[in-house]
Protein backbone atom coordinates (compact mmCIF):
# COMPACT_ATOMS: atom_id res chain seq x y z
CA UNK A 1 0.00 0.00 0.00
CA UNK A 2 2.74 2.48 0.90
CA UNK A 3 4.55 1.65 -2.34
CA UNK A 4 1.37 2.42 -4.29
CA UNK A 5 1.08 5.76 -2.49
CA UNK A 6 4.72 6.55 -3.22
CA UNK A 7 4.20 5.78 -6.91
CA UNK A 8 0.91 7.72 -7.02
CA UNK A 9 2.16 10.89 -5.30
CA UNK A 10 3.88 12.55 -8.33
CA UNK A 11 0.83 11.88 -10.51
CA UNK A 12 -1.49 13.33 -7.86
CA UNK A 13 0.72 16.42 -7.65
CA UNK A 14 0.70 16.77 -11.43
CA UNK A 15 -3.09 16.46 -11.55
CA UNK A 16 -3.38 19.03 -8.78
CA UNK A 17 -1.05 21.45 -10.59
CA UNK A 18 -3.09 21.18 -13.79
CA UNK A 19 -6.36 21.68 -11.88
CA UNK A 20 -4.97 24.66 -9.94
CA UNK A 21 -3.64 26.25 -13.13
CA UNK A 22 -7.06 26.01 -14.75
CA UNK A 23 -8.97 26.84 -11.56
CA UNK A 24 -10.86 23.56 -11.91
CA UNK A 25 -10.47 21.74 -8.60
CA UNK A 26 -14.04 20.39 -8.51
CA UNK A 27 -14.17 19.02 -12.09
CA UNK A 28 -10.85 17.23 -11.57
CA UNK A 29 -12.11 15.83 -8.25
CA UNK A 30 -15.21 14.50 -9.97
CA UNK A 31 -13.25 13.07 -12.90
CA UNK A 32 -10.66 11.40 -10.67
CA UNK A 33 -13.38 9.96 -8.43
CA UNK A 34 -15.15 8.51 -11.48
CA UNK A 35 -11.96 7.04 -12.93
CA UNK A 36 -10.85 5.68 -9.55
CA UNK A 37 -14.17 3.95 -9.05
CA UNK A 38 -14.04 2.38 -12.50
CA UNK A 39 -10.37 1.36 -12.14
CA UNK A 40 -11.08 -0.07 -8.69
CA UNK A 41 -13.53 -2.62 -10.09
CA UNK A 42 -11.76 -6.01 -10.16
CA UNK A 43 -13.03 -6.81 -13.67
CA UNK A 44 -11.77 -3.50 -15.04
CA UNK A 45 -8.46 -3.92 -13.19
CA UNK A 46 -8.00 -7.28 -14.93
CA UNK A 47 -8.89 -5.74 -18.29
CA UNK A 48 -6.34 -2.95 -17.79
CA UNK A 49 -3.62 -5.58 -17.43
CA UNK A 50 -4.53 -7.11 -20.79
CA UNK A 51 -1.77 -6.24 -23.31
CA UNK A 52 -4.33 -6.29 -26.14
CA UNK A 53 -6.06 -3.22 -24.66
CA UNK A 54 -4.80 -0.11 -26.44
CA UNK A 55 -4.05 3.11 -24.62
CA UNK A 56 -6.91 5.03 -26.26
CA UNK A 57 -9.34 2.25 -25.32
CA UNK A 58 -8.19 2.41 -21.69
CA UNK A 59 -8.59 6.20 -21.65
CA UNK A 60 -12.09 5.92 -23.14
CA UNK A 61 -13.01 3.29 -20.56
CA UNK A 62 -11.78 5.33 -17.59
CA UNK A 63 -12.65 8.90 -18.59
CA UNK A 64 -15.98 10.37 -17.51
CA UNK A 65 -18.38 11.11 -20.39
CA UNK A 66 -17.65 14.87 -20.52
CA UNK A 67 -13.94 14.72 -19.66
CA UNK A 68 -11.86 17.66 -20.79
CA UNK A 69 -8.85 17.25 -23.07
CA UNK A 70 -6.40 17.93 -20.20
CA UNK A 71 -7.90 15.10 -18.19
CA UNK A 72 -7.82 12.70 -21.13
CA UNK A 73 -4.15 13.56 -21.72
CA UNK A 74 -3.49 12.89 -18.03
CA UNK A 75 -5.10 9.45 -18.35
CA UNK A 76 -3.02 8.86 -21.48
CA UNK A 77 0.12 9.69 -19.52
CA UNK A 78 -0.90 7.19 -16.83
CA UNK A 79 -1.58 4.57 -19.50
CA UNK A 80 1.85 5.17 -21.09
CA UNK A 81 3.51 4.69 -17.71
CA UNK A 82 1.30 1.67 -16.92
CA UNK A 83 -0.01 3.42 -13.80
CA UNK A 84 -3.77 3.32 -14.42
CA UNK A 85 -4.17 0.88 -11.52
CA UNK A 86 -3.00 3.69 -9.21
CA UNK A 87 -6.05 5.85 -9.93
CA UNK A 88 -7.71 5.18 -6.53
CA UNK A 89 -4.54 6.27 -4.71
CA UNK A 90 -4.05 9.24 -7.05
CA UNK A 91 -7.62 10.38 -6.40
CA UNK A 92 -7.16 10.14 -2.63
CA UNK A 93 -3.88 12.06 -2.66
CA UNK A 94 -5.39 14.69 -4.98
CA UNK A 95 -8.23 15.24 -2.49
CA UNK A 96 -5.69 15.73 0.31
CA UNK A 97 -3.82 18.33 -1.76
CA UNK A 98 -7.07 20.07 -2.63
CA UNK A 99 -8.17 20.19 1.01
CA UNK A 100 -4.82 21.72 1.99
CA UNK A 101 -5.05 24.33 -0.75
CA UNK A 102 -8.60 25.24 0.19
CA UNK A 103 -7.71 25.24 3.91
CA UNK A 104 -10.24 22.53 4.67
CA UNK A 105 -9.92 19.72 7.20
CA UNK A 106 -11.73 16.57 6.17
CA UNK A 107 -13.16 14.65 9.10
CA UNK A 108 -15.14 11.45 9.41
CA UNK A 109 -17.43 11.20 12.41
CA UNK A 110 -18.48 7.63 13.16
CA UNK A 111 -21.20 7.27 15.77
CA UNK A 112 -23.19 4.40 17.22
CA UNK A 113 -26.46 5.85 15.89
CA UNK A 114 -27.46 8.52 13.40
CA UNK A 115 -26.47 11.96 14.65
CA UNK A 116 -28.93 14.81 14.84
CA UNK A 117 -28.17 17.96 12.84
CA UNK A 118 -27.57 19.81 16.13
CA UNK A 119 -25.00 17.23 17.31
CA UNK A 120 -23.25 17.36 13.95
CA UNK A 121 -23.20 21.18 14.02
CA UNK A 122 -21.68 21.13 17.53
CA UNK A 123 -18.92 18.73 16.48
CA UNK A 124 -18.25 20.70 13.29
CA UNK A 125 -17.98 23.97 15.24
CA UNK A 126 -15.61 22.39 17.78
CA UNK A 127 -13.38 21.00 15.03
CA UNK A 128 -13.38 24.34 13.21
CA UNK A 129 -12.31 26.07 16.42
CA UNK A 130 -9.60 23.49 17.13
CA UNK A 131 -8.06 23.55 13.64
CA UNK A 132 -8.78 27.18 12.75
CA UNK A 133 -9.93 26.07 9.30
CA UNK A 134 -13.11 25.04 7.53
CA UNK A 135 -14.18 21.47 8.23
CA UNK A 136 -15.78 19.06 5.76
CA UNK A 137 -17.51 16.39 7.83
CA UNK A 138 -18.77 13.05 6.60
CA UNK A 139 -20.70 10.75 8.88
CA UNK A 140 -20.90 7.01 9.32
CA UNK A 141 -22.76 4.71 11.68
CA UNK A 142 -21.15 1.78 13.49
CA UNK A 143 -23.40 0.18 16.10
CA UNK A 144 -20.42 -1.68 17.61
CA UNK A 145 -19.28 1.63 19.16
CA UNK A 146 -22.16 1.20 21.65
CA UNK A 147 -22.39 4.97 22.22
CA UNK A 148 -20.48 8.17 21.58
CA UNK A 149 -18.42 8.84 18.47
CA UNK A 150 -15.01 8.51 16.87
CA UNK A 151 -13.66 11.51 14.94
CA UNK A 152 -10.92 10.83 12.37
CA UNK A 153 -9.25 13.76 10.63
CA UNK A 154 -6.41 11.79 9.10
CA UNK A 155 -3.92 13.64 11.32
CA UNK A 156 -5.54 12.52 14.54
CA UNK A 157 -8.29 10.32 15.93
CA UNK A 158 -10.48 11.34 18.84
CA UNK A 159 -12.16 8.27 20.31
CA UNK A 160 -15.10 9.29 22.46
CA UNK A 161 -16.97 6.02 21.99
CA UNK A 162 -18.10 3.77 24.81
CA UNK A 163 -16.32 0.89 23.10
CA UNK A 164 -13.05 2.86 23.20
CA UNK A 165 -13.55 3.91 26.81
CA UNK A 166 -14.24 0.31 27.84
CA UNK A 167 -11.12 -0.86 25.99
CA UNK A 168 -8.99 1.79 27.72
CA UNK A 169 -10.48 0.85 31.10
CA UNK A 170 -9.80 -2.84 30.46
CA UNK A 171 -6.23 -2.03 29.44
CA UNK A 172 -5.59 0.07 32.55
CA UNK A 173 -6.99 -2.66 34.81
CA UNK A 174 -4.87 -5.32 33.11
CA UNK A 175 -1.63 -3.40 33.71
Swiss-Prot record:
Keywords: ATP synthesis, Cell inner membrane, Cell membrane, CF(1), Hydrogen ion transport, Ion transport, Membrane, Transport. It is found in: Cell inner membrane. Pfam families: OSCP (PF00213). The keyword Ubl conjugation does not apply. InterPro entries: ATP_synth_OSCP/delta_N_sf, ATPase_OSCP/dsu. GO terms for cellular component: plasma membrane; proton-transporting ATP synthase complex. Signal peptide: none annotated. F-type ATPases have 2 components, F(1) - the catalytic core - and F(0) - the membrane proton channel. F(1) has five subunits: alpha(3), beta(3), gamma(1), delta(1), epsilon(1). F(0) has three main subunits: a(1), b(2) and c(10-14). The alpha and beta chains form an alternating ring which encloses part of the gamma chain. F(1) is attached to F(0) by a central stalk formed by the gamma and epsilon chains, while a peripheral stalk is formed by the delta and b chains. Belongs to the ATPase delta chain family. This is ATP synthase subunit delta.
Amino acid sequence: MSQALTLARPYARAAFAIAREGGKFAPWSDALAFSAQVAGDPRVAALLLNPALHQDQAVTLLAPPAAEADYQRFLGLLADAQRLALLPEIAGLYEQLRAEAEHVVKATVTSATDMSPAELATITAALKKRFGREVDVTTAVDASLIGGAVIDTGEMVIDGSLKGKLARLQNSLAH
